[in-house]
């Protein structure tokens, strides 16, 4: 497995744009949060917290506890801090942090991460850091893209990178995401000494309100593709992906565009 972290290091994230186009991820995180059964005094860590909205929702569930949200994008951390200021969220902190270099020791009752860890190349480093950071009776609850996630739209995007107009920009391009199977992730947990309570692939239907909304999502999350291009060409590239995708997967009777996603849900303890 390659070393280091890919999330947010070379990509210029637009936190405000991400907030606008991440409602499916937020809803899927809420589905998990409803199962957490928090008592209200726990200490939490949210890895790759992004724009901070899920972290803030978790803060409200632990009024007598606290939560730290970390992200390796300075723009995301700044956005989250401004959107959820300490004056209104006294038990919530946002910090810059590298998911592969967690420097916490026996501090957290719960470590979470939502819709982010598929950007990280070295999951053994992430899981080792989580293990160090958990209290003896702590647990980790993680959700991110799993094997088969966004397969069709990724195939479409990769095919378009071979077209004459674009192929010169994608010499040496490597697929940027890491989508694992249940068996692979079970193996990672065992290697770092965490006990798997649940590792499950869950299909999800991401629904976009038309082709323009699909393009907004592509602009937000397909940064490994678009940021290889001159800025003046990015919108054309995104539009070409969206058009090719709806040819392969037509809009439904309401004009919505469906993208089949797969989440890997993980719960583990010491």
Per-region residue spans from a language model:
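A short acidic, Gly/Pro-enriched loop at the edge of an enzyme's catalytic core
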Residues: 100-111
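Conserved catalytic/acceptor-binding region of the Class I
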Residues: 139-209
């Amino acid at each position: 497995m390659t070393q280091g972290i890919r999330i947010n290091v070379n990509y210029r994230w637009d936190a405000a744009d991400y907030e606008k186009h991440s409602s499916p991820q937020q809803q899927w995180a809420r589905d998990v949060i409803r199962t957490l059964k928090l008592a209200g005094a726990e200490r939490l860590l949210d890895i790759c917290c992004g724009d901070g909205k899920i972290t803030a929702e978790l803060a409200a569930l632990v009024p007598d506890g606290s939560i730290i949200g970390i992200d390796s994008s300075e723009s995301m951390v700044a956005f989250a801090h401004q959107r959820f200021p300490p004056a209104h969220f006294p038990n919530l902190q946002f910090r810059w942090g590298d998911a592969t270099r967690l420097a916490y020791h026996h501090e957290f009752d719960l470590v979470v991460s939502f819709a982010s860890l598929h950007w990280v190349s070295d999951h053994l480093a992430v899981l080792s850091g989580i293990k160090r950071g958990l209290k003896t009776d702590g647990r980790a609850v993680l959700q991110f893209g799993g094997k088969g996630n966004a397969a069709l739209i990724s195939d479409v995007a990769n095919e378009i990178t071979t077209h004459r107009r674009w192929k010169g920009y994608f010499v040496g391009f490597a697929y940027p995401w890491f989508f694992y199977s249940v068996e692979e992730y079970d193996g990672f947990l065992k290697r770092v000494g965490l006990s798997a309570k649940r590792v499950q692939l869950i299909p999800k239907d991401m629904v976009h309100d038309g082709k323009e909304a699909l393009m907004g999502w592509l602009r937000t999350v397909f940064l490994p593709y678009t940021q290889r291009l001159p800025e003046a060409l990015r919108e054309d590239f995104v539009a070409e992906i969206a058009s090719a995708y709806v040819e392969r997967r037509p809009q439904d009777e309401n004009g919505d565009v469906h993208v089949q996603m797969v989440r890997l849900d993980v719960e583990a303890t010491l």
